[in-house]
Swiss-Prot record:
It comes from the Bacteria. One of its GO terms (cellular component) is cytosol. The keyword RNA-binding applies. Residues 625-693 form the S1 motif domain. Mg(2+) binds at D489, D495. It catalyses: RNA(n+1) + phosphate = RNA(n) + a ribonucleoside 5'-diphosphate. Residues 724-733 have a biased composition (Basic and acidic residues). One of its GO terms (molecular function) is 3'-5'-RNA exonuclease activity. This is Polyribonucleotide nucleotidyltransferase. Residues 556-615 form the KH domain. Belongs to the polyribonucleotide nucleotidyltransferase family. Pfam families: KH_1 (PF00013), PNPase (PF03726), RNase_PH (PF01138), RNase_PH_C (PF03725), S1 (PF00575). It is found in: Cytoplasm.
Length: 733
């Protein structure tokens, strides 16, 4: 295969695709150059069908630090585990690709995206999604694409496709939409309380752009695409299927309609165990025993799948007896835990999430170092899904892709209503512990997070609630479901999560198992979700009407002071010596930003006050006409040096000690004396002159002695300064 290059212009940037030059041993590969971002995508497929009961698709998105001209950190100085952003991007690509493989396809497929060069204004994520679809489409892997995806922004009332970094910073919308040329099949979004109408329009605008990219892919596939390989699909024995359906379908139908989750699972499992036992005995000596028993398990799964869908589409009956637009029973509680900074427990049917709030100084914020310039992340929402939440045993360890994705969705939903840093200078962490799950646990974590924030006194702009919508589709006949449970998610065609306030949507996420959904279905799903969201908000507001006016007693208190930027070095000191001393002495935590905002944190208000006093003293400046209670620290023949405060001294010239003539300074003051002085002058070098006599009653004019000073004498002429501060009595570290 020889190198071929295809070019177009998309969203104002050149899009270049190269094939036939690199990674030629993969089933399909492409280099996508978008702006100055370059992504290599390679797609490969195993030769044989995998043995599991699912399609083993793996999508990776690898960020190479050299792509942004950055040197890796850490001891090994090389890339380690994927960043959170890389993990989320891999999920973003996986989700629209997965539905495009045939039912029963079980060969392992890997799609590896490597970012080779990075342009922050030309999304490598969208280039990787384009490259993933293209590499699969031009390969011999039986992929029913192509698909494509775009980012959509909303600035000044206009939609922008693949916005630049600058445009993203002011956009009210951060939307990724993917799909085929006929329909949308994946959505991921955060929004600043936008209406359903605006969100729907954004989705449709995005899909129009997707169609352009698909047309470009089809042109490339026509030129360099391979013929598709013949692969074995998982098929069950039709005679065996007919036999099992005839004998056991009525039993399974009854089991599926048991309303309570655990009882329903027990009933369906009992039927499956009965059937399995019968056929294990019947075919115990058969040479294809393993294949037959695999078919039995698959047939039983298909029977349960078909019955759940039939009940909903034909009888309009859900497994737990609810109406199609009915929410499960709701419950909300705040202050579930003592000592923590805030907590909320939210229950929807058999799905339950506990959210716990922790507030910290801004110095505790997460530092994110990826391809973008290093930045600090103020708000984190972490989601944990232990196996006991579904009554099972299983793996424990670091969070997987699903947990990272669900945490990020909650983070997007809630960060839109957080107060600004100026209003609330804290780092904020929410942890959602899923205690029970029967579907829609990510949305329960959002509701619990709202409760925890409000209980903890975080002044959010409005409460946020989330709901998961489902879809059962049979050709033109479809049913949109409100608040889907686990069974409906597993056997349904769509998981459409919508979170927001009463004013509008703050987050969207959609995954589907069919090839796409129409604008009509999206409109209906958004309308039903709004109704459900308002019902949940009613409960949240009844539980806690507004954020509490004060933080929890255990939360760190904060006080802020503003200092001049040129004084920052005084407070920090050489090598951090001064600020470390303040922290050690008072037990507080101190953050100073580049604009001179000093934030002091502690659970002890007295410690905060002491630290403020020390810092104020460090940056304090003497002012003309101000009076100070000072201490005499040095005596010279021309006057006395007094300490006004901290490291600021002033000279009281001998002529300013008293109204009467003074021949000897020590006749008026001694070292260690405390005196009141008034600042009368500060010269260009910051040297301070003060007077004692101006604060004393002036004697009658006739008694006033005549002073004869040398012509042109300045009180600082003979000033040599303190031991370590020769230049000026005003000193800085």
């Amino acid at each position: 295969m020889t190198k071929q290059v295809f070019k177009t212009v998309f969203a104002g940037r050149e899009l270049v695709v190269e094939t036939g030059q690199v990674a030629k041993q993969a089933n399909g590969s492409a280099v996508v150059r978008y702006g100055e971002s370059t992504v290599l995508t390679a797609a490969t497929m195993s030769k044989k069908m995998a043995t599991g009961d699912f399609f083993p698709l793996q999508v990776n998105y690898e960020e190479k630090m050299y792509a942004a001209g950055k040197y890796p950190g850490g001891f090994n100085k090389r890339e380690g585990r994927p960043s959170t952003d890389a993990t989320l991007t891999a999920r973003l690509i996986d989700r629209p690709i997965r539905p495009m493989f045939a039912e029963g396809f079980r060969n392992e497929v890997q799609v590896i995206n490597t970012v080779l060069s990075y342009d922050e204004d030309a999304s490598p994520q969208m280039a990787a999604m384009f490259g993933s679809s293209l590499a699969l489409s031009i390969s011999d892997i039986p992929f029913n694409g192509p698909i494509a995806g775009v980012q959509v922004g909303y600035v000044d009332g206009k939609f922008i496709i693949n916005p630049s970094k600058e445009q993203k910073e002011v956009s009210l919308l951060e939307l990724t939409v993917a799909g085929t040329k006929d329909a949308i099949n994946m959505v991921e979004s955060g929004a600043k309380e936008l209406s359903e109408d605006i969100m729907l329009e954004a989705l449709l605008k995005g899909h129009e752009a997707v169609k352009e990219l698909i047309a470009f892919q089809e042109e490339i596939v026509a030129a360099v695409g391979k013929g598709k390989a013949e692969v074995e699909l998982l098929h069950v024995d039709e005679e065996l299927q007919a036999e099992i359906v005839a004998a056991y379908n009525s039993d399974l139908q009854k089991a599926v309609q048991v309303e309570e989750k655990l009882a329903r699972e027990a009933a369906t499992q009992a039927v499956k165990d009965q059937v399995t036992a019968v056929y294990e005995e019947k075919y115990a000596d058969h040479e294809e025993f393993d294949r037959i028993m695999r078919d039995v398990a698959e047939i039983l799964e298909q029977m349960e799948h078909a019955e759940v869908r039939r009940l909903i589409t034909e009888d309009k009956v859900r497994p737990d007896g609810r109406k199609v637009d009915e929410i499960r029973p709701l419950d909300a509680e705040v202050d579930y835990l003592p000592r923590v900074h805030g907590s909320g427990l939210f229950t929807r049917g058999q799905t339950q999430a506990l959210s716990v709030l922790t507030l910290a100084p801004m110095g505790e914020t997460q530092i994110v170092d990826g391809l973008d310039p290093e930045y600090k992340k103020r708000f984190m929402h972490h989601y944990n899904f232990p196996q006991y939440s579904v009554g099972e045993t299983g793996r424990y360890g670091a969070p997987g892709r699903r947990e990272i994705g669900h945490g990020a969705l909650g983070e997007r939903a809630l960060e839109q209503v957080l107060p600004s840093l100026e209003e609330f200078p804290y780092a904020i962490r929410l942890v959602a512990e899923v205690l029970e799950s029967n579907g829609s646990s990510s949305q329960a974590s959002i509701c619990a997070g709202t409760l925890a924030l409000m209980a903890g006194g975080v002044p959010i702009k409005a409460p946020v609630a989330g709901i998961a919508m489902g879809l059962i589709s049979d050709g033109s006949n479809y049913t949109v479901l409100t608040d889907i449970q686990g069974l409906e998610d597993h056997f349904g065609d769509m998981d459409f999560k919508v979170a927001g306030t009463r004013e509008g949507i703050t987050a969207l996420q959609m995954d589907i198992k069919i090839e796409g959904i129409t604008a009509e279905i999206l409109t209906e799903a958004l309308a039903q979700a709004k109704k459900a969201r308002f019902e949940i908000l009613d409960l949240i507001e009844a539980t806690i009407p507004a954020p509490r006016p004060e933080l929890a007693p255990t939360a760190p208190k904060i006080d802020t002071i503003k200092i001049d930027v040129d004084k920052i070095k005084i407070v920090i000191g050489k090598g951090g010596e001064t600020i470390d001393k303040i922290i050690a002495e008072t037990g507080v935590k101190i953050d100073i930003d580049e604009e001179g905002n000093v934030s002091i944190y502690s659970s002890d208000q007295d410690a905060i006050n002491r630290a403020k006093e020390i810092i104020a003293g460090l940056v304090r400046e003497a002012k003309v006409d101000e009076v100070y209670h000072a201490k005499v620290v040095r005596i010279e023949k021309f006057g006395a040096f007094v300490n006004l405060f901290d490291k600021t001294d002033a000279l009281v010239h001998i002529s300013e000690l008293a109204w009467t003539r003074t021949n000897n300074v020590e006749d008026v003051v001694q070292i260690g004396d405390e005196v009141d002085v008034k600042v009368i002058k500060i010269d260009a070098k910051g040297r301070v002159d003060a007077s004692m006599k101006v604060l004393l009653p002036r004697p009658p004019k006739s008694d006033k002695p005549k002073h004869h000073h040398d012509k042109g004498h300045h009180p600082h002429k003979e000033y040599k300064g303190h031991k370590d501060h020769q230049e000026s009595p005003k000193t800085e570290e």
